[in-house]
């Protein structure tokens, strides 16, 4: 269908019409126990207000139907658009919204318009106001509510435009909204199926390597449709006032200044690109005042062509406001041309300039490596600057005192990004009274919440750190045998430890929220929710953390699941599920991730359901690829084979697995791993590969962590491409892929071509292409079918095998 035809269709049929019923005869159901668990309603999601006194409670169904997933979409400039809604295409909405007090004793159902569904909800930083969006026949509506009258939300607009951003954000005061109203679509001319001309691209000799993107613009009609759908009018709504228009443009999210009188605005401009997503299109960045008048044209950001892979644009980027200052703009600039391959003593600098932008900007600080953002103290005088060393995969965080520019910054964090054990935890932040993100502070103390990775699994913690001495005090740590993580700190009371919200779970108890008081006896625990186990019939499944070593001594780990009725001495068929990750050194590669004490949620297309069919499952088996970041993939195949062999040996040595009945599977890069293991080893009797990429010559400018191009590392690209070794895949391989996969690199064609290669070489394979599905699978019909196909495949080629 031509774009002109589609625009006519939008104008004539902009109602939310139901998608035509699809023939379901081809979709299958898995065993009843699996189907029942998939259909079990999930617990509601909880969003606490910033002061933690109240919460929004959102209810949804387990899975959407295929008709909802397959609603028509426009695939333009790297974004999928539900045109009648003037919003991003999504596969599931929510059905109920409630306001509850902290303890859940008082709950008020917030009314939704008849026939409409809840898209999302959020709190203002003042904790008194909340907003939510609904979708219906006329489009997307924005509503504003107050905690004192939750049953009487106010309709702000029934024509929200939420394509490039959420479509609304809070004013500095927190009691009003910035929002974007969809501009009327232009009148469509008569549909013309004859192209106006050829599609041309040209290059002029400059280096411009690009990752592979999907859903890009393809022609002038695409560009016109994208522009028409994204164009909107930006408004500011304050209490007691009429909405004030800031004009029509291709608006991004506005960023109001602390003074409430100025706002930073971003808009997309032409020329568009046919090779990059909209985030690389030219941008206009400007500051306007409370009367919508232009104060300063901050930047005209050019089309992002020629930006090196893993690099950044030259010129100003990452604009934002400095907290505790009325209207001081802060931004970053590259000093190395934005190229991570260029040698440089200093890569970035941060600058600031106050409205009305008189004089020259002030340089705040420089970073030796690529800047990763700023985290401010509440007074705006000290700032934590993050930076990242791409070559070493190393992260640092330095505390700068801007009142003492000559003082050396103090190091708060300095570690490999893969060093889970050395992670000091994330600095906890909150929104101040003007809506700016700042560190949570008690005098000189700031707070950190972390995962607490250890050899025994994760034990989350809460620390506080003195910014004067940099000493850290452990305030709380999760008890052994469970998993409890910090959600948020309550507003602090001077002279006492803070209370904090946590999310508690254990192998037998589903996640629930708690309030912990560190000043009270025995931790002062108060239960805030009481969500029940959605699948109690599966709770008998056994689960344990298993540690072992690769042949070269690298420590590895996995979580082993066994059926509830398993008896010691009984050997089961084994299913190994993994995802390779890259490491610079063995010490971090061997660190344990995750926790064996988390609640196991059986849902969706999860491979954990195989345990209900009599399988042992080794989940999240570590598959480290270790070496120099530039060359580690030269030994990718050897390393994953070694890790897989170690996992199988361990399960067999434990007496739970039968070496003659072992299968392997993975998703995305894990699917790539699966195909390689079948092509280059005889460890497995079958495999399941979902949504993978198998021919790396089709991702020639890098993939995953590979930094070299196909022409720089031809042998490696060929060596790790299972498509080019399809003649070696002599074990049965089930290939599953969403027909609408938009993940970079994993085009659906990748699975289609691998299937053809296996078939042509006399191998055994089955290709399942899922209509309407993207990189993950959402529709109930699709999920059920994937489970049925997977269970049957394993039983047919592995589970039913005779044991030698």
Label every PLM stretch briefly.
Residues 23-540, 555, 590-591:
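Beta-propeller folds
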Residues 150, 288-293, 356-357, 389-392, ...:
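Secondary-structure transition/capping motifs at alpha-helix termini
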Residues 527-570:
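N-terminal cap/lid segment of alpha/beta-hydrolase-fold proteins
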Residues 145, 180, 266, 288, ...:
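Generic beta-strand/beta-sheet core signal
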Residues 1-10:
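Bacterial N-terminal signal peptides that target proteins for export
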Residues 9-19:
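Bacterial N-terminal signal peptides
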Residues 91-94, 102, 587, 594-804:
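Active-site-proximal cap/loop segments of hydrolase catalytic domains
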Residues 566-570, 575-596:
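Short, surface-exposed "cap/lid" segments of acyl-processing enzymes
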């Amino acid at each position: 269908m031509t774009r002109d035809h589609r625009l006519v269709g939008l104008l004539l049929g902009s109602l939310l019409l139901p998608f035509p019923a699809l023939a379901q005869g081809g979709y299958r159901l898995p065993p009843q126990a699996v189907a029942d668990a998939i259909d079990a309603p999930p617990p509601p999601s909880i969003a606490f207000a910033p002061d933690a006194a109240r919460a929004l409670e959102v209810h949804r169904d387990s899975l959407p139907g295929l008709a909802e997933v397959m609603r028509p979409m426009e695939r333009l400039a790297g974004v999928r658009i539900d045109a009648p809604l003037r919003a991003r295409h999504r596969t599931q909405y929510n059905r109920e919204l409630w306001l509850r007090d902290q303890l859940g004793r008082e709950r008020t159902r917030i009314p939704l318009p008849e026939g409409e569904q809840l898209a999302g909800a959020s709190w203002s930083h003042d904790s008194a106001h909340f907003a939510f969006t609904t979708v219906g026949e006329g489009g997307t509506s924005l509503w504003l509510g107050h905690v004192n009258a939750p049953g009487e939300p106010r309709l702000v607009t029934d024509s929200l435009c939420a394509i490039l951003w959420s479509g609304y954000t809070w004013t500095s005061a927190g009691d009003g909204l910035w929002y974007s109203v969809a501009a009327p679509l232009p009148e469509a001319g008569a549909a013309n199926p004859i192209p106006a001309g050829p599609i041309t691209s040209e290059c002029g000799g400059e280096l411009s390597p690009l990752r592979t993107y999907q859903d890009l613009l393809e022609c002038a009609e695409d560009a016109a449709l994208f522009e028409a759908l994204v164009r909107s009018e930006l408004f500011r709504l304050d209490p007691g006032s009429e909405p004030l228009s800031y004009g029509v443009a291709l608006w991004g999210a506005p960023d109001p200044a602390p003074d409430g009188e100025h706002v930073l605005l971003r808009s997309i401009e032409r020329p568009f690109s046919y090779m990059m997503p909209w985030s690389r299109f030219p941008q206009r960045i400007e500051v306007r005042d409370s009367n919508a008048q232009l104060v300063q044209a901050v930047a005209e950001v050019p089309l992002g062509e020629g930006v090196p892979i893993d690099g950044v644009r030259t010129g100003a980027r990452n604009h934002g406001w400095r907290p505790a200052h009325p209207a001081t703009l802060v931004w970053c600039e590259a000093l190395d041309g934005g190229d991570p391959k260029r040698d440089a003593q200093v890569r970035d600098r941060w600058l600031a300039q106050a409205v009305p932008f008189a004089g020259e900007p002030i340089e705040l600080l420089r970073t030796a490596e690529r800047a990763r953002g700023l985290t401010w103290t509440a007074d705006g005088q000290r700032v934590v600057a993050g930076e990242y060393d791409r070559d070493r995969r190393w992260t640092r965080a330095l505390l700068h005192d801007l009142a003492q520019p000559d003082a050396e910054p103090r190091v708060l964090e300095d570690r490999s990004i893969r060093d889970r054990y050395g992670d000091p935890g994330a600095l906890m932040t909150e929104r101040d009274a003007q809506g700016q993100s700042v560190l949570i502070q008690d005098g000189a103390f700031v707070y950190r919440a972390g995962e607490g990775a250890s050899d025994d699994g994760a034990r989350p913690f809460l620390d506080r750190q003195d910014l004067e001495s940099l000493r850290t005090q452990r305030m709380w740590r999760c008890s052994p045998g469970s998993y409890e993580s910090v959600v948020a700190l309550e507003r602090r009371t001077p002279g006492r430890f803070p209370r904090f919200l946590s999310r508690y779970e254990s192998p037998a108890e589903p996640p629930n929220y708690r309030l912990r008081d560190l000043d009270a006896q025995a931790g002062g625990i108060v239960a805030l929710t009481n969500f029940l186990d959605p699948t109690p019939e599966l709770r008998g499944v056994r689960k344990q953390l298993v540690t072992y070593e690769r042949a070269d001594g690298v420590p590895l780990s996995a979580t082993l699941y066994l059926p509830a009725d398993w008896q010691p001495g009984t050997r089961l068929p084994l299913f190994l599920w993994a995802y390779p990750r890259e490491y610079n050194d063995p010490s971090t590669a061997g660190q344990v991730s995750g926790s064996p004490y988390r609640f196991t949620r059986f849902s969706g297309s999860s491979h954990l359901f195989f345990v209900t069919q009599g399988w042992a499952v080794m989940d999240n088996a570590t598959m480290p690829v270790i070496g120099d970041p530039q060359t580690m993939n030269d030994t990718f195949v050897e390393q994953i084979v070694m890790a897989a062999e170690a996992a199988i040996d361990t399960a067999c040595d434990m007496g739970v697995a039968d070496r003659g009945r072992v299968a392997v599977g993975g998703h995305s890069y894990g699917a790539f791993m699966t195909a390689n293991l079948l092509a280059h080893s005889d460890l497995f009797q079958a495999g399941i590969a979902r949504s993978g990429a198998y021919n790396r010559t089709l991702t020639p400018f890098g993939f995953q962590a590979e930094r070299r191009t196909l022409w720089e590392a031809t042998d490696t690209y060929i060596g790790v491409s299972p498509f080019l070794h399809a003649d070696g895949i002599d074990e049965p391989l089930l290939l599953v892929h969403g027909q609408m996969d938009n993940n970079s690199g994993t085009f659906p064609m990748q699975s289609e071509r691998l299937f053809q290669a296996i078939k042509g070489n006399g191998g055994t394979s089955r290709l399942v292409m899922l209509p309407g599905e993207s990189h993950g699978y959402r529709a109930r019909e699709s999920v059920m079918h994937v489970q049925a196909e997977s269970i049957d495949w394993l039983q047919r080629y592995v589970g039913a095998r005779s044991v030698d």
